[in-house]
Swiss-Prot record:
This is Protein NirF. Keywords: Cytoplasm. SUPFAM superfamilies: C-terminal (heme d1) domain of cytochrome cd1-nitrite reductase (SSF51004). InterPro entries: Cyt_cd1_C_sf, Haem_d1_sf, Host-pathogen_enzymatic-act. The gene is nirF. PANTHER family: DIHYDRO-HEME D1 DEHYDROGENASE (PTHR47197:SF3), PROTEIN NIRF (PTHR47197). The keyword Glycoprotein does not apply. Transmembrane segments: none annotated. Required for the biosynthesis of heme d1 of nitrite reductase. Could have a dehydrogenase activity yielding sirohydrochlorin from precorrin-2 or dehydrogenation of propionate side chain C17. It is found in: Cytoplasm.
Length: 392
């Protein structure tokens, strides 16, 4: 048999195989947002290295992402309305589309089949098939009286029961979109929940949806076990207060953290972390810290609380003992600390240091830096273990 005619084909196939990333799992992979360049890095959490840089993801100035349930794909939500499906194993963009004019986040459904995006323009939520990115449903937000636009949508999260929950900033509402019966959602609307809900979170057990209010103090809470009870106001003093203090950056409500029966919350405009009883949502303590907190995050064993800060204190990270509420260490990773992310079992914490163009890895037990990678204006850090958690 003469194999000579097949030789060029075999060489081509072998060359193609040599260019593929090696076979591996995806459980320890992460994604770093490089906000200035519209690029991301794919991270190896075990080796503490960068596997690849993927470019062409558009405006990532306020980007976030979620993971597919098999942890192979990341869905990146860009500020320019871009929705990008990123293949972490092939290290490339799988699919990408521009679905709106100005987006502010997204979520993936409980069964992993649907990806939802919240939009400022056009105001509303669009829901896509996670495999094909084909449009499944479009949910326009409330039309604003006398204006040619809809309310902006914020605080979109997934909830148990194949539901999405989100807030309407301009019209002061919370909506539940229930997809449990198919691709046409059943909508439940809660009106007059407070002025200008600007962000929201869902508790780790998926029971409570909490919306922060920009236009007044307090928070709006919806019990998803008993939505028939409506929205109630909690934490009446939470906010900027009667004396309007300068707020250098509104804290992300997704940066709240719950450790055992305590919730640790960044105070707005104050150099404090508030401690709440997570059973009745009443304040029990206030911890003085180095600046205005942005993200307050718990180590996965709940023993420590890590806090970063708005300018001009954004070169620091403080570590709080969750039992005594004492600040046990002040770290100085460098200028422009934007985000932190723990590994799934808590042996590492990754810190983005924007103004130093660095991504740092720290040992949260010894409180020592154990690695550093170059990065272009790094911001959000997301590891694939998030795929198995409600609201992440």
């Amino acid at each position: 048999m003469n194999l000579r005619p097949l030789a060029p084909l075999l060489l081509t196939l072998l060359a193609g195989c040599s260019q593929q990333p090696p076979l591996r799992g995806s459980g320890d992979l992460g994604v770093l947002i490089e906000r200035a360049d519209g690029s991301v890095q794919i991270l190896d959490g075990t080796a503490k290295t960068s596997l690849a840089r993927v470019e062409g993801l558009g405006d990532l100035s306020h980007a976030s992402l979620v993971f597919s349930r098999d942890q192979r794909y990341a869905y990146v939500f860009g500020r320019d309305g871009g929705l990008t499906k990123l293949d972490l194993l092939a290290q490339r963009i799988d699919k990408r589309l521009i679905q709106g004019g100005n987006s502010i986040g997204g979520a993936i459904s409980q069964d992993g089949r649907l990806v939802a995006v919240s939009n400022y323009e056009p105001g509303g939520v669009k829901v896509f098939d996670s495999r094909t990115l084909e449009l499944v449903a479009e949910i326009p937000a409330t039309r604003l009286p006398g204006q040619d636009r809809n309310s902006r949508v914020v605080g979109l999260v997934d909830a148990p029961g194949q539901r999405f929950v989100f807030s309407l900033f301009d019209s002061g509402e919370i909506w539940i979109a229930d997809f449990s019966q198919g691709d046409t959602p059943h909508l439940t609307r809660f009106r007059d929940i407070g002025k200008q809900p600007y962000d929201a979170l869902i508790s780790p057990d998926g029971r409570y949806y909490m919306a922060g209010l920009f236009g007044e103090d307090g928070m709006a809470q919806l019990d998803l076990w008993h939505p028939e009870r409506g929205v109630r106001r909690v934490l009446g003093d939470y906010g900027r207060g009667q004396r309007k203090l300068p707020v250098y950056k509104m804290p992300h409500l997704e940066g709240w953290t719950i450790a055992s029966d305590q919730a640790f919350v960044p105070a707005v405009g104050h150099h404090q972390v508030l401690v709440l009883d997570a059973r009745d949502w009443k304040q029990t303590d206030a911890i003085d810290v180095a600046g205005q907190p942005v993200f307050v995050m718990t180590r996965p064993d709940d023993r420590q609380i890590w806090v970063n800060f708005a300018y001009p204190d954004n070169d620091k990270v403080q570590v709080i003992d969750s039992e005594t509420h004492e600040v046990i260490e002040t770290l100085r990773p460098g200028p422009g600390v934007l985000h932190m992310e723990f590994s799934g079992r808590g042996d590492q914490v990754w810190i983005s240091v924007r103004d130093a163009d660095q991504l740092q890895v720290w040992d949260p037990y010894r409180l020592k830096r154990i690695g550093s990678l170059p990065a272009r204006s790094p911001s959000g850090i997301f590891f694939s273990h998030r795929a198995q958690h409600i609201g992440l």
